[in-house]
Amino acid sequence: IAIALVVEGRYSDFTLVNETVNAARNNRRTVRFAGLINAVLRRFLREREQISAVLQKDLDVRFNAPLWWIRRIKESHPSNWEEILRIGTLRAPMTLRVNARRITPAAYLEELKARGIPALRVGRSAVMLESPLPVKDIPGFTEGIVSVQDAGTQLAAEILAPQKNEQILDACAAPGGKTAHLLESADCHVTALEIDPKRAELIKSTLLRLGVEATVRAADAAMVSEWHSGREFDAILLDAPCTASGIVRRQPDVPWSR
């Protein structure tokens, strides 16, 4: 942990070494390792540039991802795979989706400004906070004025571009962000499917908070006869195969655990 903090650079080298060694000395289980910890940290500080240069040659260390993951990204995005992997190692910003039925992004930005919360518009309905906030402290969240949703994720509903009275299927809908975005964008009719009954309840909670309605069913989209009424859909939103590759900045263990 101390070495990670050294790399991060938020504290002075002296402070990190001193506090880490003192913490080891004050714990009966680690007191005997205090000298070793001190030696390792000081050597790292002396040789950090050489160590970093060696580690940067190993792609799995450089991008904090297994080689199979790196190969897959490289095959899918041959022209910018390094940038994609690099961004995956950074902390994700907090981005909000403004509920177009309740307020405009410009008006919401003014409200944030009045509260002393720095933010920037980064998409049609996307507002990025300069610093993350607990959900309970986000102005308008509880009232359904905004939702937390990455800017990239918001593109799904925008590209689908729902129209008035269209019948739309969201085939893998939990926790309901994309379903809600469709309904905020147009007076359409959405059928939201989720195979997990508990996650289907999350969709209902999301829609209730935002003041929009959809037909929510706990069902397997592949078992069409069990849920489909026979009415044709004008559009289908399918977020599959649900690899979680888009959330590695928030859950860095994803490449290692899947």
Residue ranges with predicted function:
Residues I1-R258:
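S-adenosylmethionine
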